[in-house]
């Protein structure tokens, strides 16, 4: 998260120096403070939690779990596919990736998010340390960072309209996302 935060600042500084700003750059300038504050809180909170409780236990993780990597078969059987990012890590990171992708697609629907987490907790109960870790993962504005990072590392002569739309959608979903964050805190 610290590296991502440095990348956010680098992109903001680049945009600040530009005289003529595109719609995307103006959108970033208008929303940066809110998302960067969350990014700092997430990084600081996670670091403090690890200093206090130590590193969470590591397990094998999928590394990129989302709805595209789960196959449903007959009779309620499931299979997880594409383990090319598998690694040893904190298991709730897989839960975070899966849940975040689903919630982004469903406008951060609080009931859906809580049902997903409660169902997971029934099968594999989360301890207090994992819950805190999960909260800070959700707090970090990963999608915002992805958009800014894509912008910074791409050619800036032409910025896709889709990038502006994605930023606007993030801003529109912020209230619902904050409600979800309050519920899991």
Where does each model-flagged region fall?
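Active-site acidic catalytic loop and adjacent metal/ATP-binding pocket
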Residues: 43-93
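Active-site activation/catalytic loop segments of kinase-like enzymes and analogous catalytic loops
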Residues: 92-125, 138-158
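ATP/Mg2+ or Mg2+-diphosphate-binding catalytic cores
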Residues: 145-185
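Gram-positive cell-envelope targeting signals
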Residues: 20, 35, 78-80, 99
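A generic short alpha-helical patch detector that favors 3-5-residue windows
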Residues: 3, 87-90, 108
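ATP-dependent phospho-/nucleotidyl transfer catalytic cores
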Residues: 1-60, 115
């Amino acid at each position: 998260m610290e590296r991502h935060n440095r990348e956010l600042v680098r992109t903001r500084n680049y945009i600040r120096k530009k005289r003529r700003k595109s719609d995307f750059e103006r959108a970033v300038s208008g929303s940066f403070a809110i998302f960067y504050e969350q990014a700092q809180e997430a990084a600081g909170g996670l670091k403090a939690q690890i200093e206090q409780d130590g590193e969470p236990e590591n397990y094998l993780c999928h590394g990129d779990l989302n709805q595209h990597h789960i196959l449903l078969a007959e009779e309620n059987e499931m299979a997880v596919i594409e383990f090319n990012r598998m690694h040893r890590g904190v298991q709730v990171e897989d839960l975070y990736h899966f849940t975040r992708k689903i919630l982004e697609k469903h406008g951060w629907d609080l009931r859906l998010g809580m049902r997903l987490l409660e169902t997971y907790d029934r099968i594999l109960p989360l301890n207090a340390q994992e819950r805190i870790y999960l909260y800070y993962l959700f707090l970090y504005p990963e999608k915002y960072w992805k958009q800014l990072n894509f912008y910074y590392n791409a050619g800036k002569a032409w910025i896709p309209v889709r990038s502006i739309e994605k930023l606007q959608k993030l801003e529109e979903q912020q209230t619902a996302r904050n409600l979800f964050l309050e519920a899991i805190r």
